Structure formats: structure tokens, C-alpha cells
Amino acid sequence: MRGLFHFVVMSLLIFMMICCKTIYPSAEVNYLSGTEQTVSVRVIGVGSNEEQAIINAEQKVFDVLFFRGLPESQQKMPMVGSDESAEKLKNKKYFDKFYDGKRHKTFVMSSIPVSGLTKVNSGKSITVNVKVNLSALRSDLETSGLIRKFGF
């Protein structure tokens, strides 16, 4: 009886660990060039069509800038914070408007597809060179209260 109990408990634990596995999305964002005010990156976006894949690519760039930072660039540290889920929850209104309202496009200086659309398991992917206006983005984050002004 005791062996059956241990078997059931172990089976339940293994089942729970398998079900709770978190799959983190890959950012696939690579730094190309930049200054203090702008950054250019190459990013892979995925979507059901070319437009959706490009929007996905642009949004990945902002996720990296906000929550991870971009090594080798002027923006090595995350702009907002490293706890993505907590920051998005704390500033839900801002991020909903930023992504769902496509407000992120106001900070994209250029978005140039450099590859054709290719089929992948989750839809279609495209490689895009994206240039972002960092100074305007930083100013917007300060105005919205997500980050503090430098030196104040």
C-alpha cells in the first residue's frame, strides 16, 4: 500500500512539472549600429502574414530594450526593468496602448524587410532591420512615469 502511495505521489509531481513547463520566446534581436539617440537592429518576426510578422519583429525590439538591454549598444541595461511580467502588470495601461494600440510605431524610424517571408511551424517569419528613436522613447517613458529622469 505504501509503495502505491509513493507511486501516485511521484506520478502526480512529474505530471505537474511537465504541465508547468514555461517556454520562453526567443527574442532573435541582433545589434547592428547606433548612437546615443538611435539604435539599429536586425530581428526575426513571426506572424500569419507579412504585416503581422513585421509588427511582431518591431515589438520584439521594444521588449529587448525595455526588459533585457542590448549588448554592444548604448542601451546595455534594460530601460524599464528586468522583471518583464511585473513591469507589464504594474504599467498595464501603458503597455496595452503601446503594443495593442500600435503606439510603438511612433518610435520606429524605419522598418526594412531584408528577407522574404518563409514558412515556419508557428506561421511565417521575416527578417527585418529596425531603427528605433531611443531619445524619444526614453522621453516618453519618463513622461509616463515608467522611468526617472537621469540625475533627478
Description of each model-found segment:
Residues 1-9:
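Bacterial N-terminal signal peptides that target proteins for export
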Residues 8-16:
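Bacterial N-terminal signal peptides
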